[in-house]
Amino acid sequence: LNPVKSKVILLDPGHCKKHIGARGNGLKEEDVNLDIGKACRNYLNKYSDVTVYMTRTNSKCVKKLKLGDCLTARNHLAKRLSADSLVSFHINWDPEKKRSGAMILAAYNSGYNKYVSTTTQALGSSIMANLQELGIKSEGFWFRTLHDEKYKNGAKADYYSIVREGVLNKIPSLIIEHGYVSNKS
């Protein structure tokens, strides 16, 4: 983030009681995501040049919508707030119980919106470096595309709605998978 200019950040604790996430070791992804979101908000609120909003501050969904519409609503909220970025918090699950580490899901360089792909990858790299300083293993970046949906330039669209809608709305949007609920540690 450029420290010279004030920033508006929308934090998105992924999932909710209606659109539940992964389960493992007595943990519910939507609850862990909310705890991470609140901690991040509290940390960022220390900076006078950063304005922080959250898509939810309790277990309720953003709106009473089906999942795809709910995800799109999160990006539309970022657009209404003129957010500089949208960061969605998640926790992974894997059948391999020992798998660990954080991963960033970001826009690939489709050529459709270079600013968004470049910015999300830079922001993701910075976030991952901070997570590594906390002792969390990096699983790197994950780029995934849709086979049947394309951007206006003909490039395959990003798979994850949060990321894809960010590209379409010109708002750098990424997903952080902070670890695995399937791993006891």
Language-model segments: which ranges?
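Non-catalytic propeptide/linker segments at domain boundaries
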Residues: 1-7
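Glycine-rich N-terminal loop/short-helix segment of MobA-like nucleotidyltransferase
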Residues: 12-25, 183
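Glycine- and acidic-residue-enriched helix-capping/strand-helix junction motifs
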Residues: 21-35
